[in-house]
Amino acid sequence: MIHSTDNSFCLGYRKDNNLKSDEFFIKRFDNDLCNNLINDFNKFISKENLQKINKLSVSIGPANFNASRLIVVLARTISQQINCPIDSFSSFEIMAKRIALKNNIFTNKKTFWIYKKLKRNGFIAGKYEIYHKEKDSSDLVIRETILPKGVKELESKEVTFEANYDDKEDLKELLNLANKNLLNSNLHPWKKVLPLYPISPIN
């Protein structure tokens, strides 16, 4: 799994869906991500283990513009070279469950927005919905109903929460989401995985 935030680059690996096998690599970066990305990746996973990977997942943003672009290119390249399926999730979708749990949002069909204030004007915001297939479902499932996009203002009548990146917890959730997609055969060819650019890189 490959993930990035505004200032960190993260890798995660899980063997046979065993949570105890989870391995993580988290590194803060300034302007040096491009120079060290491949070296850090090669240190994290050996060529032998790379060939054993049967599924890749990558976060596509919104996050640092260059980081999102670079990690998606890396994930697409690996998927193509070792011929394994790939899926992707927005950074907000990855943190949505954690935010819902923290704020006691459990009601089925309940919706909320996650937003990030831009340096200049406006926000990036995505919409999420609690989704239980069964009334007694103990596992909190959240659907992304609107991909993160640029908006001028937040809806005053909607429930909103500011985006809050947590490298390790979000890596764990990315692994969990990826496993659910694998079990549901919800996978894509590498060509369909693209970075999410709600705004231009200058904002």
How would you name each of these model-derived features?
Residues S21-F24, Q51:
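Recognition helices and adjacent regulatory flanks at domain boundaries
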Residues Q51-I60, E158-Y165:
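Short glycine-rich phosphate-binding loop at a beta-alpha junction
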Residues D40-K55:
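Phosphate/pyrophosphate-binding loops at sites that engage ATP/ADP/AMP, CoA/4′-phosphopantetheine
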Residues M1-S21, F29-D30, D87-N203:
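Oxyanion-binding and handling regions
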Residues I26-K43:
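N-terminal phosphate-binding loop and adjacent alpha-helix
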Residues N42-K43, R76, Q80, A100-L101, ...:
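Short glycine/serine- and small hydrophobic-enriched flexible loop segments
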Residues K55-S91:
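DPxDG-like acidic metal-binding loop motif
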